[in-house]
């Protein structure tokens, strides 16, 4: 059994060995075939690569030859252009040489002619000096003087044209802003009286007001500081005094006494005290109402009281509080038209005349007094400057200051806003005509439009058109320095030339 197994094992080993050898032989045969095929493929690839390399070399050689031909052609073209330019330059050079020769000849001719002209000029100058009895220096001075006159004339024309253009543009813009502001500011107040008239129920009341031996009227005048004028006017007593607040106190006290009927010194003193308290309350209320209506908030209480006191002040008959409110409206509206914040402009306008509430108690111009009061109560520097500068006492430091000055002038110049005494009015008109007539060449002058315009007729043979311009400026300067007036005064110079001939 074991032998059989061993024989079987040997047989299996032998068979496997033969099979392995057969597979090895087959693999070797395949390897050789693969090697042979690879060698054949490598040879083919080598030949193909050599062929491609030869084709690439041929292509490169052709491209190089083509590029070389193109470069040679370009070089030849450039050479031809250079040759053409050289020929052109030669021609131009020849032409320039010819022109230089011609110019040299012309220059020589010019020099010869210049020499002859100089010689002729010297002869003519000598002849002119003999004929005119003027030396060359004198003639030069005369020529310079004539030239100066011509330049001055041209300069005056240019200045006039520029002034007219600037005035047209400025007037147009200013009129737009001011007209818009005025249209939006509906001012309905008129000039107010500076005296008070108290009506009486009958003429017998006059005797009771006077009292025994005049003690009642003396007590009332002493306590109020106001003069009582009792004359033949029926059923009326006139109160006259320097201080409008005192007049108001006297009016209220007198009206209360008339209603009460008991008029004696003790009762008068009691009523005067009540009237003073009533006026103080009214002053505060008026100040607060003014700030409310104008939209100006945050004022110090003392400034509010001073505003209220302006109700009892007038300037040329115009109520100062109403005027201040109108200036605030106008300044604010103009600031809005200019694209600015109207708050400061309105505040400055409302306070611009605050100094008039105290200027009879403190010495100095009301503008500077008002600015000091505003500064004392912590108003901004813009407001302080606007108050101080609205009459030109100091320089403007802001646009708001200029707007306040303009609004003040508009409010004051509005027809019916202010009035003057007849005597001051007549004196101002006479002074206007006197200033105009003081200039040489003035034929006559008229102050018209209630003193807001002076019309001047000049002699045309003495004053030319440009002299009129100079005269108008000089007259304006004198009016501004010598006269005091509300608003503005127009100086209108008229020069008329007439030529008359008669046909026979």
Curated annotation (Swiss-Prot):
Pfam families: HD (PF01966), KH_1 (PF00013), RNase_Y_N (PF12072). SMART domains: HDc, KH. It is an enzyme of class 3 (hydrolase). One of its GO terms (molecular function) is RNA binding. The keyword Cell wall biogenesis/degradation does not apply. Its EC number is 3.1.-.-. Belongs to the RNase Y family. This is Ribonuclease Y.
């Amino acid at each position: 059994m074991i032998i059989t197994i061993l024989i079987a094992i040997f047989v299996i080993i032998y068979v496997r060995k033969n099979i392995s050898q057969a597979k090895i032989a087959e693999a070797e045969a395949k390897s050789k075939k693969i090697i042979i095929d690879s060698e054949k493929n490598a040879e083919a690839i080598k030949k193909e690569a050599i062929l491609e390399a030869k084709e690439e070399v041929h292509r490169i050689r052709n491209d190089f030859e083509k590029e070389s031909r193109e470069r040679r052609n370009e070089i030849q073209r450039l050479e031809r252009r250079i040759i053409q330019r050289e020929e052109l330059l030669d021609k131009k050079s020849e032409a320039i040489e010819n022109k230089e020769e011609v110019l040299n000849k012309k220059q020589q001719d010019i020099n010869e002619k210049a020499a002859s002209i100089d010689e002729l000029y010297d002869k003519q100058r000598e002849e002119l000096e003999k004929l005119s009895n003027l030396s060359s220096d004198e003639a030069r001075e005369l020529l310079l003087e004539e030239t100066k006159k011509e330049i001055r004339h041209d300069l005056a024309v240019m200045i006039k044209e520029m002034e007219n253009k600037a005035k047209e543009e400025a007037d147009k813009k200013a009129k737009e802003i001011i007209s818009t502001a005025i249209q939006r500011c509906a001012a309905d107040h008129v000039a107010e009286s500076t005296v008070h008239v108290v009506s009486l129920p009958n003429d017998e009341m006059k005797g009771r007001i006077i009292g025994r031996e005049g003690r009642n009227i003396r007590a009332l005048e002493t306590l109020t500081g106001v003069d009582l004028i009792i004359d033949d006017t029926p059923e009326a007593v006139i109160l006259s005094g320097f201080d409008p607040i005192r007049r108001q106190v006297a009016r209220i006290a007198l009206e209360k006494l008339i209603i009460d009927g008991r008029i004696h010194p003790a009762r008068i003193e009691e009523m005067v005290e009540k009237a003073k308290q009533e006026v103080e309350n009214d002053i505060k209320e008026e100040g607060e109402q003014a700030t409310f209506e104008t939209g100006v908030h945050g004022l110090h209480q003392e400034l509010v009281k001073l505003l209220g006191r302006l109700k009892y002040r007038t300037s040329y008959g115009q109520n100062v509080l109403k005027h201040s409110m109108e200036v605030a409206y106008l300044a604010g509206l103009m600031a809005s038209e200019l694209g600015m914040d109207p708050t400061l402009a309105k505040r400055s306008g409302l306070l611009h005349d605050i100094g008039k509430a105290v200027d009879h108690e403190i010495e100095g111009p009301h503008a500077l007094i008002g600015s000091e009061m505003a500064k004392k109560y912590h108003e901004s520097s813009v407001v302080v400057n606007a108050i101080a500068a609205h009459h030109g006492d100091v320089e403007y430091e802001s646009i708001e200051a200029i707007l306040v000055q303009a609004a003040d002038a508009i409010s004051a110049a509005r027809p019916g806003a202010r009035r003057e005494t007849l005597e001051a009015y007549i004196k101002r008109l006479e002074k206007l005509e006197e200033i105009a007539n003081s200039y040489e060449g003035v034929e006559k002058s008229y102050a018209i439009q209630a003193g807001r315009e002076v019309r001047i007729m000049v002699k045309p043979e003495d004053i030319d058109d440009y002299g009129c311009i100079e005269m108008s400026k000089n007259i304006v300067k004198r009016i501004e320095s010598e006269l005091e007036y509300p608003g503005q005064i127009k100086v209108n110079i008229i020069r008329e030339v007439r030529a008359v001939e008669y046909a026979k």
